[in-house]
Amino acid sequence: MAIDGAVSQTAVEAWDKRWATSEGRADWLEPHPAVVAILPELHARAARRVLDLGCGVGRHALLLAEHGFDVEAIDGSLAGLAVVRETAAARGLPVSLHKGLADALPFPDAGFDYVLSWNVIHHGTLGDLGRRLGEIWRVLRPAGLLQATVLSTRDANYGIGRAIAPDTFVIDQVERKGHPHCYCDAAALVGLLTGFDLLTLRYWALKSDASLYRR
């Protein structure tokens, strides 16, 4: 099972609504410490071109641009992209913005040294997650880095809501209505990452899994 267009649109509409208000954006303005921490590694690798996949209101795209990387940022939410555009212009930061989803990235093969996807690719089934990882693999250069988050089966919300596929549930709350979320344990994640070298795997009980992979 894959997410159909109607469900994807429901998710985009929910994020559009959140990003339209300062209150909705408030928790999504500061870069995550794990992303800040990888900056020295990216510089050590002489990474240049980077992709923020599911950029939201741009907290990480802007950080990467501040540190001199050539940043492409993509999101399905026009409201989120508008915030990134306005903030980048105000701060004099070059960020190339694209409207789109993770399932079919509008970029050529092997174009990025680093792909970041924070709280994005688990919106769907495990099949959707695998397809998105395939797209990320396609656009990463050899030895490029992927830093991403997924939901763990240890998450407090695992098993809550309507099961629509293995380890995939829809929670009928206002903010998540129509959003399938898939969950995986470490073994399932390693299986989905066939071809990648797993460099680090960390678990945050209150937030999400965050992992670093090399193509």
Predicted feature residues:
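A short acidic, Gly/Pro-enriched loop at the edge of an enzyme's catalytic core
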Residues: D103-V115
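A short beta-strand submotif of the Rossmann-like class I SAM-dependent methyltransferase core
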Residues: S117-V120
